[in-house]
């Protein structure tokens, strides 16, 4: 096989491969949204179920700078309950991803002692959230549906 022919064949195979990856993007973005939303929503529900313990944890364990423990508990819990719903719907998806990224970052910063495995989980979640914020939540979203109708996207 000559060099130009080899280059053409390689380029054609690469184009097919990237076409498959492009076709998988909507499903991958949705899977990331559903996974992240579940993690944070369940965390918010746990905080809501035992509010006194949540406030105690924010008083003793989670040292959120500049906020009272009550305010930090309320804001963190509200973010963990509202933003995942937006993320699942893909409504204001980038805003929701950025908001959860901040919640995730504050959780890491606020913990005085975090186990390496827990830190690794937070880095993974942060990476997924950063990807959704940077690249968008994908075409299987209300943001995409609204944009196709000429309305502002999230």
Predicted features and spans:
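Extended, low-polarity transmembrane helix blocks
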Residues: 1-49, 66-78, 82, 89-154
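Perimembrane loop-to-helix junctions flanking transmembrane segments
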Residues: 55-67
């Amino acid at each position: 096989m000559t060099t130009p022919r080899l280059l053409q064949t390689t380029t054609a195979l690469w184009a097919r491969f990237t076409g498959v990856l492009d076709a998988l993007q909507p499903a991958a973005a949705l899977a990331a949204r559903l996974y992240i939303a579940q993690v944070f929503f369940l965390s918010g529900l746990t905080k809501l179920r035992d509010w006194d313990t949540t406030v105690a944890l924010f008083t003793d364990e989670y040292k959120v700078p500049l906020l009272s423990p009550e305010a930090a508990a309320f804001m963190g819990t509200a973010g963990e309950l509202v933003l995942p719903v937006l993320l699942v719907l893909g409504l204001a998806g980038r805003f929701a991803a950025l908001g959860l990224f901040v919640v995730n970052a504050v959780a890491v910063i606020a913990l005085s002692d975090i186990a390496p495995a827990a830190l690794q989980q937070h880095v993974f979640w942060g990476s997924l959230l950063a990807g959704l914020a940077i690249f968008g939540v994908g075409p299987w979203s209300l943001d995409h549906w609204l944009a196709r109708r000429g309305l502002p996207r999230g």
